[in-house]
Amino acid sequence: MKDYKSTLNMPTTGFEMRANLNVKEPKIQQFWVEHQIYEKLLTKNKDKKPFILHDGPPYANGNIHIGHALNKILKDFVVSYHNMNNYYSPYIPGWDTHGLPIEVALSKKIKLSNLSVNERREQCKKYALEQVNNQIQQFLRLGMISDFKQRYLTLDHNYEIDQLKLFTYMLKKGFIYQDFKPVFWSWSSQTALAESEIEYADRQSSAIYVKMKVVDHNDLFTDKPTSLVIWTTTPWTLPANLAIAIHPELVYSLIEYKNENYIIAKPLVETFVKKVGFEDYKWIKDFKANTLEKIKYISPISKKHAFVIMDEYVSANDGTGLVHNAPAFGLEDYYACKKYGIETVVMIDQFGKYNALVNDLELENMFYEDANQVILNRLMNEHLLIHHEVITHSVAHDWRTKKPVMYRATKQWFVSIEKILPNILQTLNNDVKSTSFRGIERMHEMIVNRKEWCISRQRVWGVPIPMIFDENHNAIMDHELVENIINVLNEKGVNAWFDLDVNAFLTPKYLSMKNKTFYKEKDIMDVWFDSGSSYNILGHYNLNYPADVYLEGYDQYRGWFNSSLITGTILNNRAPYKYLVAHGMVLDGEGYKMSKSKGNVVDPLDVCKIYGADVLRLWIANSDYQNDTRISEEILKQNAEIYRRIRNTLFKYSLSILNDFEPSVDFSFNVRQEEQFVLNEFNELHIKVIKAYENFDYQTVVKLFNKFILDLSSWYFENIKDDMYCLAINDPIRKQIQSAVYWILKNSLIDLTPIIPHTTEEAYSFLKDANKKESIRLEDFYDQSQFQFKKGIAHVKAFFSIKDQIFNELENARKNNILKKNNEAFVTIAKNLILDDYLINNPKLLAKWFGVAKIEFANNTNVANANFKKCLRCWNHFPDEEMYNDELSMNCYKVINKIK
């Protein structure tokens, strides 16, 4: 038996089935860098409409984690797509390079306390730049389009000056002020925090009911000992008690229990007595709140006399309706006491320890949480503790250190949000869209209840607050003076603030005041003020405000989205973004948060080593990223399987049958109806893909392509094999098939480049095309409107309407050993199944589409073995009249003769 394999057009390509992405991807990335593909892309698009994704700066500290990968790769999808679809879309990455984490990380390496302020700042800058350079290399490994040469750092001189100018503008407009009042204080970071830096976690606390003995009651009560009863979950604040607040509209009851009197808000009496076991209490009388105002009592720890005040913040929902007030450690307490002229005494220092103002030798220098038990013991010993229990409740924590925070009164700088809130809400509602139906709503929730933003921090590594104080330590709110400070810093560098004497920043007006002493502000600005002014960099690159899109994790609704919205609205009277896209967090395969202690951390660079960056990118594209998404070995394997289908079924097979095709010579849209059908199917896919990219919906892109490849491989690729392998190499039918496959392959490569750019670049390099670009990234998405294939498609659709039913019949025939392969089959099809006259009149074409030996139409559908002879070249089965001899069909014989 003769071997006819040498006469066939067997598929061949150098594009490997095995991806070896960990080896190939770095080489492809090097190709992009050496050939300046990013620069050429921007040059190509420079006159097109801009689409600007403004990069939210990650923190320059440590290696990138899987959350970084999710964020940066999503951004790369956005930028890559727009650059390939008629937009000018530069990607300018940024880094947040100031703040506490850098100081903390550096303190583990060197003793910062031994250095001067500027020496510490120089060390912080050096460390931050090292971290940026490290992260750049790691981000590049993910396959990002940017060359990272154009970037912004919050420590850049021009950036800092822009930020200082923004501060000055806000000061001029009356949005910035200084005040002394309780703010969130992180003893673990030794600095004030803004609300956006607070996260809440459950924590156990002591909840206590405490007696505060009345000493002067103007004969309101009986002669029996009388106490005001308070409830608190912060026993450590009792040494700072300076008042008890009651609600002016509440009624208060005097009750008796075991020869002692107690005052409780009337609506809470029953709850109180059940909780503390006073069931057999005796009601004595009720009072209006104003009759209790100014009644004196003994503060239980300090033993000083204090008095009752009234304020509407007091609630009858829990506790006793009497609130212990420590104005240094509660904002409501502070405002309530301020109305009565009660002085605020801050008896806890920046480290969370009692200072000398506590006037208590046992408590002085004690950490505030450690004092809880000491205070409980004293209350018990003095019979002032009515009831004690441990409760679990939500407590504010420093989101960096994860330690609890307190309210602590300090002098701080604030931005008034109340003053700009109407403008913020207007621009949020009118100018901003979001991919999430709750996106704008969440932003609204985050901003509407914020009265102010504390922007001062008690650290050294950051942008200084450019304010000067007089000899009474009052801030000089002189705009000309502040502008002069910024001019000096612009000339000499921001470090000059920490290095030069105050006189270097004074204007002649103040220098002439020879007998006056002036002081520089020591605080720096909140890093959220740093990053919240990052939109200023757009102007340096001739890009317009606002940016088209901000894309970050959903935690940035309270962070960068929020701070940028506040400053941007103050400066430009509209939000700095048109579109908000928020992604969730990355969890492990079981849905748990990743942590080193659990051993469930997934390193994106390890994923790149094992699977390749393109599989990592495909996992991200294939995730519902707007919610928390999971990653595990099993999930990565599932996406690796999808990747293999794309690589081998679509890319490799298509390349292998295009090895003798030159588009500049052979390509044509004048193709058979089969090709028209698949081209039309691809065009419909392409339209949906473009829409999905526009909507930041990458999961739909993956699903669409996955289904298309399955459909393509299950019929069209199988159907064309005979023609591709067996027809003469230059047969017009082969060229029509290759034209369709070329078009689908090339545009699939383009469509998928935003998601798997390394693989599409590799496949593109094997695509024979005299007119192709230097890189796949320099290609453009095609205009789908040019496709109007209608003629002939209806016949293929009619075939598809019965395809599955006939294939099921063929499968049953194989199971019943009637057939070994479909091409042996003689199929009769019930006439009522197919309504297309063209197909009824062309049974040979229909047989070819079904891949069977013969088709006829009858009253019933049936599958039998045709018992035809097999051609040893094409392996199809033919009746005697279509065989040249016992080995070859007439078609194969003619082709071989042409080859000879």
Curated annotation (Swiss-Prot):
Query: Which residues does the record give as ATP binding sites?
Result: 596
Going by the UniProt record, its keywords in alphabetical order are: Aminoacyl-tRNA synthetase, ATP-binding, Cytoplasm, Ligase, Nucleotide-binding, Protein biosynthesis
Domain of life of the organism encoding this protein: Bacteria
Xref: PROSITE patterns: AA_TRNA_LIGASE_I
| Signal sequence, start to end | none
What terms describe the molecular function in GO for this protein?
aminoacyl-tRNA deacylase activity; ATP binding; isoleucine-tRNA ligase activity; tRNA binding
Q: Which residues bind L-isoleucyl-5'-AMP?
A: 552
A GO BP annotation = isoleucyl-tRNA aminoacylation
InterPro entries assigned: aa-tRNA-synth_I_CS (IPR001412), aa-tRNA-synth_Ia (IPR002300), Anticodon_Ile_BEm (IPR033708), Ile-tRNA-ligase (IPR002301), Ile-tRNA-ligase_type1 (IPR023585), Ile-tRNA_ligase (IPR050081), M/V/L/I-tRNA-synth_anticd-bd (IPR013155), Rossmann-like_a/b/a_fold (IPR014729)
> What cellular component terms from Gene Ontology apply here?
cytosol
Alphabetized CDD domains for the sequence: Anticodon_Ia_Ile_BEm (cd07960), IleRS_core (cd00818)
The subcellular location is: Cytoplasm
> Reaction catalysed by this chain?
tRNA(Ile) + L-isoleucine + ATP = L-isoleucyl-tRNA(Ile) + AMP + diphosphate
Q: Where can the motif 'KMSKS' region be found?
A: 593-597
Q: Name one Pfam family in it.
A: Anticodon_1
What EC number(s) is this enzyme filed under?
A: 6.1.1.5
Residue positions of motif 'HIGH' region? 58-68
Q: What does this protein do?
A: Catalyzes the attachment of isoleucine to tRNA(Ile). As IleRS can inadvertently accommodate and process structurally similar amino acids such as valine, to avoid such errors it has two additional distinct tRNA(Ile)-dependent editing activities. One activity is designated as 'pretransfer' editing and involves the hydrolysis of activated Val-AMP. The other activity is designated 'posttransfer' editing and involves deacylation of mischarged Val-tRNA(Ile).
Q: What is known of its domains?
A: IleRS has two distinct active sites: one for aminoacylation and one for editing. The misactivated valine is translocated from the active site to the editing site, which sterically excludes the correctly activated isoleucine. The single editing site contains two valyl binding pockets, one specific for each substrate (Val-AMP or Val-tRNA(Ile)).
Give the multimer and partner information: Monomer.
Protein family according to the UniProt entry: Belongs to the class-I aminoacyl-tRNA synthetase family. IleS type 1 subfamily.
Can you name this protein?
Isoleucine--tRNA ligase
Native organism: Ureaplasma parvum serovar 3 (strain ATCC 700970)
